[in-house]
A protein has these predicted regions:
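Glycine-rich phosphate-binding loop of ATP-dependent small-molecule kinases
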Residues: 1-210
Length: 210
């Protein structure tokens, strides 16, 4: 089974990818991870990507698609995979198609901007031990203090409301159109975000006929 997980930042794609990876016994192909691995291993596309990154430039789509294609050709992807991080745009989706990379299903986790703002802006992390909290869902016993080590709890820059809002704007402009792209191909399966991680996982598996 070859899957794409779509959803706004904060929709829980990474968490759901981990669960699906276990349930379906297929690997999650994270674009960030395979990009770093390609650079570390010195592959031709990895070296090309590194040249752009060293110059402080964005890695072009054709290089990203090349790295993804290399990774999907490995043995552990023969029975399927969960694609995470690419495509982010219509151009990338079209490039994947042109490269002969196909998918069986595209899951879109549906969640409101308001819920995402609440979810992400409530996150706190211990600057000493890295433990994670949420001011509503998993609050610390003492506000601003880590239960585990007594360290200071801080809000990451990525979780600040203004940053979250900016990321959502980019998602709606560049990535959300992929839903129509894959709906036209009969691949899109929208799944409503549920109150718990487990319920969302069950809804995704149900949409996949599992």
């Amino acid at each position: 089974m070859k899957l794409i997980l779509l959803g706004a930042p904060g929709a829980g794609k990474g968490t759901q990818a981990e669960i699906l990876c276990r349930e379906l016994s297929i690997p999650t192909i994270s674009t960030g991870n395979i990009l770093r691995a390609a650079i570390k291993n010195g592959t031709p596309t990895g070296l090309k990507a590194k040249s752009y990154m060293d110059a402080g430039q964005l890695v072009p789509d054709d290089v990203i698609i090349g790295i993804v294609t290399e990774r999907l050709a490995e043995d552990d992807c023969k029975n399927g995979y969960i694609q995470d991080g690419v495509p982010r745009t219509i151009a990338q989706a079209a490039a994947l198609e042109k490269a002969g990379i196909t998918f069986d299903d595209v899951i879109s986790i549906e969640i409101s901007d308001e819920t995402i703002m609440e979810r992400m802006s409530g996150r706190r992390v211990c600057e000493s031990c890295g433990a994670s909290y949420h001011m509503v869902a998993v609050p610390p016993k003492q506000e601003g203090v880590c239960d585990k080590c007594g360290g200071k709890l801080v809000q990451r820059k990525d979780d600040a409301p203004e940053t979250v809002k900016a990321r959502l704007e980019v998602y709606h402009k560049e990535t959300e159109p992929l839903k129509d792209f894959y709906a036209q191909r009969g691949l899109l399966k929208p799944v409503e975000n549920q109150p718990s991680v487990e319920e969302t996982s069950r809804a995704i598996l149900h949409a996949l006929g599992r």
